[in-house]
């Protein structure tokens, strides 16, 4: 069923598409916990399909008076997102928009809350800071969603306007820096395999090794989850190998700091015994001991540009589904040096 452009959709339209009574539609929207999950899903899908909005919000539909946007964050506790959110909030405030934050870490519990925000038109648009979206944007019945922009992550299959860096080249440069110092046994602590940016960073690492004629050693590639704990745990596994690495490239500063802590706990001197390089340049990276060499992402600019891109859509401008690529920089600090002879 196509979205009604000439007149606002009614509750009767929703009921017809969902195959339920108007009373059930009303009950689902007013008291969603009073109906079964199956019924709620049917009604929510129908609401999105026909473009229905509750009567008391209908006047705001055309005037776009919500003035709020939703930022969906993979993990609100990850310090990497702080500057991105600040960039979004400052750009939003300059244009009179309020920013709501949605933590996607507990996706199952949050899915209905996010869908409800869409249904009731309490947000005008969304900025996604990861590729793990808490609903299926590909479904035909959900084409009435508000404008969306993807920031930080790059997932071309979603066909969304995107602001991000070149993760593959940045990872290549980080690995090449270790090679230029003379390291040949370089390990990689990656992020989750499900995240496209981690796949690009891993490919950058692999390409750098191949370009230098070094072997790709499976035992040197190990997956983490962007936490200090995983960085420490996986560093211990790498450093207890029969032939441990002399350097570790981590997909995030948080994991790199965890790896540094573990290496020092095991009695290693940094960077003399082990070089470690991170990714992101979070605020604490320069204060670690030693200061962390890392790939600096322009986090504030990613957030600021993503909000400006969303504003273009909210103002009715046509926005390309392509990406806006920002520059990253390798910051060489004290956690890397040439290996011992």
Residue spans for each PLM region:
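Flexible loop/hinge segments that line or gate small-molecule binding clefts
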Residues: 105-106, 128-173, 194, 214, ...
